[in-house]
Amino acid sequence: MSYYQQQCKQPCQPPPVCPPPKCPEPCPPPKCPEPCPPPVCCEPCPPPKCPEPCPPPVCCEPCPPPVCCEPCPPQPWQPKCPPVQFPPCQQKCPPKNK
């Protein structure tokens, strides 16, 4: 006789009453740390200190035009004047930046 046949011969029984499930205690609320204190901010940065703008470059004065001698009066024994050597300017100007 199988297990099912044995079950069939027994009179019907009401299903057992299950006890209500035992629940654990509800979870305690999570313990939060104290809220963070507001960050301590430093003073705003001062504006950067810039050096004074560069002064304009100091240029030497342009060389004065050469002082030319008057043309020599024509002379029969010296038809042409010798070339006049002009002294160079005392100050040499720096090359101009392009």
Curated annotation (Swiss-Prot):
InterPro entries: SPRR2. Keywords: Cytoplasm, Keratinization, Repeat. It comes from the Eukaryota. GO terms for cellular component: cornified envelope; cytoplasm. It is found in: Cytoplasm. Expressed in uterus. GO terms for biological process: epidermis development; keratinization; keratinocyte differentiation; response to estradiol. Sequence repeats lie at residues 21-29, 30-38, 39-47, 48-56, 57-65. Residues 21-65 are annotated as: 5 X 9 AA approximate tandem repeats. Induction: Up-regulated by estrogen in the uterus of ovariectomized animals, with strongly increased expression detected in luminal epithelial cells at 6 and 12 hours after hormone injection. Belongs to the cornifin (SPRR) family. Cross-linked envelope protein of keratinocytes. It is a keratinocyte protein that first appears in the cell cytosol, but ultimately becomes cross-linked to membrane proteins by transglutaminase. All that results in the formation of an insoluble envelope beneath the plasma membrane. This is Small proline-rich protein 2B.
